[in-house]
Swiss-Prot record:
Similarity-based family: Belongs to the bacterial ribosomal protein bL17 family.
GO annotation terms (biological process): translation
Classification via Pfam families: Ribosomal_L17
UniProt keyword list: Ribonucleoprotein, Ribosomal protein
Record GO terms (molecular function): structural constituent of ribosome
InterPro entries: Ribosomal_bL17, Ribosomal_bL17_CS, Ribosomal_bL17_sf
Gene Ontology CC: cytosolic large ribosomal subunit
Gene3D superfamilies hit by this protein: Ribosomal protein L17
Subunit structure as annotated in this protein's UniProt entry: Part of the 50S ribosomal subunit. Contacts protein L32.
Name of the protein: Large ribosomal subunit protein bL17
Amino acid sequence: MRHRYSNRKLNRTTSHRLAMLRNMANSLLKHEVIVTTLPKAKELRRVAEPLITLGKKPSLANRRLAFDRTRDREIVVKLFDVLGARYATRNGGYVRILKYGFRKGDNAPMALVELVDRPEDAVAVEDNSAE
């Protein structure tokens, strides 16, 4: 039975998977749009949305939690100053996943991951980790 299998392993060790998702969440919060594979995008949403929810309540404890999860001061500042204010009235659903075709080398399904209500001048960053 499939019960209690909560996340995808993505063919990586635990430390590699957690580091990869942390780096992808940092890239998403920094650039506000990234391109990656569809399974990675679905796991990324589970990491990024709670971070944005933390940013909506600006307390010292939440800043420390956000820094613990991102390990990047610039991301924490943007999370609490820019993104927290932008999503103050939205109750979840901060990340949009759009199917983006298939990768040329291995035909892997790709996805464009973006923050909703983002400014239109943000440019997509390609994920070249598997190429």
